[in-house]
């Protein structure tokens, strides 16, 4: 984790580090600009690092990080580490290029994209999908849902997607 991250992410990371008897490692942001960089992660991550969380954009400053470079730096030192990204703030403001990041998870919360509270979306790698996790008893191993979906929430995101498609059509460069 890093000092750049949302307190909820840091709290969960610290909790699970304690539960698994591992040291929580904190990447300190640059005081001059509030950013975290691949170089800063390279100074802290070690070959025994098992999980790294990265905030794609700050909810306080709006600063986004070079996710691809940070993930590459982590993989060069701890190739087996799971890399989980909080994309909640970034999703509505930047193009998400999952295939370029070499990460294991990316989560968003649609309420930050003109939708409602109470649900979210995540992309997980095949490697993370197969990891042992809390799940319904006797359910499929790759199921990460613990209950019934709120279908109203999914209906609202359909309108958001239509709006974003319309907005994107008005911009020349949609890379």
Predicted features by range, described:
Residues 1-175:
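Pyridoxal 5′-phosphate
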């Amino acid at each position: 984790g890093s000092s750049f991250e949302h307190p909820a992410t840091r709290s969960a990371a610290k909790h699970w580090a304690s539960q698994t008897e591992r040291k929580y490692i904190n990447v300190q942001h640059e005081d001059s600009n509030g950013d975290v960089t691949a170089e800063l992660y390279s100074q802290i991550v070690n070959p025994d690092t098992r999980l790294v969380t990265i905030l794609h954009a700050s909810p306080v400053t709006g600063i986004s990080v070079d996710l691809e470079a940070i993930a590459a730096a982590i993989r060069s030192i701890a190739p087996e580490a799971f890399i989980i990204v909080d994309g909640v703030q970034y999703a509505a403001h930047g193009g998400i290029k999952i295939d370029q990041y070499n990460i294991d998870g990316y989560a968003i919360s649609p309420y930050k994209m003109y939708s409602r509270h109470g649900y979210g979306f995540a992309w997980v790698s095949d490697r993370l999908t197969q990891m042992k996790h809390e799940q319904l008893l006797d359910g499929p191993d790759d199921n990460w849902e613990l209950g019934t979906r709120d279908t109203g929430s999914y209906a609202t995101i359909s309108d958001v997607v239509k709006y974003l498609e319309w907005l994107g059509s008005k911009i020349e460069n949609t890379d």
